[in-house]
Amino acid sequence: MAAPDFDVQQLPHPVPPPDEDGSTFEHNAALKAQYYGRFIDGFLFADDSGLEVDALGGAPGVHSARYAGLEATDADNNGLLLQRLTGVADRTARFVCVIALVKNSKLVHLFRGEVEGRILDAPRGAGGFGYDPLFYYEPFGCTFGEAFIGDKMLVSHRAQALEAMFTFLRSLLSAEVTLPA
């Protein structure tokens, strides 16, 4: 997501990650942003994202990256997901991204993006990462693993959340929005 009117930078030095112990994307995104916000002055954002499958009660959810274990690979996670969906007809799913924006470690706002799709019976495509080869996106007629990266970036859950955040920041900087004290 291009935001030429903003100078987005990474932290200037390596910082060990916090424990992501929340049960929601919102909690984990806020936890990370507030944690990393201690190391800089001003605005900082962090995200938490993952895949929710309706038939699995929203799993893998916040555990998407470590669904099959702490050291699991994408192939391990995809394999476990397919195993748990064996014989399941309803494979509706969504990618979710929540971005937490903080200023001086104080939570300012949360932004959520979602993209709906369904999980196939087998992976298709070598592009993307994570669950992309299993996630079929109807408007494209293919999986995110088969989609052109530029097309995927236009509709992704992360792109939606980022665009919402940049719109908010533009409003804030033009004084259309004010921060609570």
What are these regions, as identified by a protein language model?
Residues 1-181:
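Anionic-ligand binding patches
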